[in-house]
Each structure stands twice: as C-alpha cells, then as structure tokens.
C-alpha cells in the first residue's frame, strides 16, 4: 500500500487511487464524540489523517461507532498516544459490555502527540455483529488527555 506521506511528498499522481484508503480503519475524529475534541498532529504524518482527539474533562470522554462489517470474529486495534506526563485509563465496550481496560503508562520518550508517543492496544477474538456499538472511554490523568488516533477492525480467519 503506497504511503500517504510518500504520495504527498513526491506529488506523484495516485493513478490507481490506493493512497489513503484504509477500509479497516475508523478515525477517532470521525466517531461519535462525547467530550473529546479534535486536535491537529504536527507533523501531520505522525497520525492517521493528521489528526487525533483529546479529552479535557476529568470525568472522561467517549468515542463510539456502530460496527457495519460482516458478522464474525475480529481483533480490534486501538491506536492511541501515551505521553510521559500522565497515565490515562482506557476502556473498550462492545454493546455495553466491557471487553478490555488498560492504563497508558509506557515509558515513551516524549511529552507530545506524535510518532514517538503513538502506540497500539490489540483486543483479540471478539464476536461482532452489524449494529454493535463499539465505545472507547478515555479518562485523562495529569496532562495526558486520553488521546486517540484510530481503531482498526481486523477479521480473523478461524
């Protein structure tokens, strides 16, 4: 898959229309947001779509969407930013049921949203059906505002 960065930097036309198409990806800024606000990531290539979302409410925020693919078994990747200035808590729910929870407390080398703080949580083996609501709850800590980039839905072969 041609990269978004290379396409933009080279200015070579994308004759086959492949750049920027990530069918399995749902951008955080495109989800139904409750409390989260969109932020630009600089440089833009350090986040999918050049944007992310942050939560400024101490009680937490949610980002949700409806599953619209074929029913089956899936892995979910949650791409988020883990900064050195806090330990946000994340919870993932499928149709109201808690399926995963973690604290973003890796020791990454930066205090800014970007490539050095971008990390991923994989949740494996979830049975999903069309219409299921997938909801990510982020609870900020310190100066880390439970930042999210995107979610990927990966069908499993059994």
What is the meaning of each model-derived region?
Residues 1-158:
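Extracytoplasmic
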């Amino acid at each position: 898959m041609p990269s978004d960065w290379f396409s933009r930097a080279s200015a070579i036309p994308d004759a086959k229309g492949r750049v920027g198409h990530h069918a399995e990806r749902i951008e955080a800024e495109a989800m139904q947001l409750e409390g989260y606000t969109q932020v630009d990531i600089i440089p833009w290539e350090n986040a999918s779509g050049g944007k992310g979302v942050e939560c400024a409410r101490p009680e937490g925020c949610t980002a949700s969407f409806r599953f619209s693919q074929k029913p089956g078994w899936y892995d979910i990747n949650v791409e988020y930013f883990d900064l050195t200035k806090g330990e946000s808590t994340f919870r993932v729910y499928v149709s109201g049921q808690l399926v995963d929870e973690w604290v973003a407390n890796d020791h990454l080398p930066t205090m800014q949203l970007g490539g050095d703080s971008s990390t991923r949580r994989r949740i494996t083996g979830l049975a999903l059906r069309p219409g299921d609501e997938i909801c990510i709850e982020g609870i900020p800590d310190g100066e880390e505002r439970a930042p999210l980039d995107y979610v990927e839905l990966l069908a499993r072969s059994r």
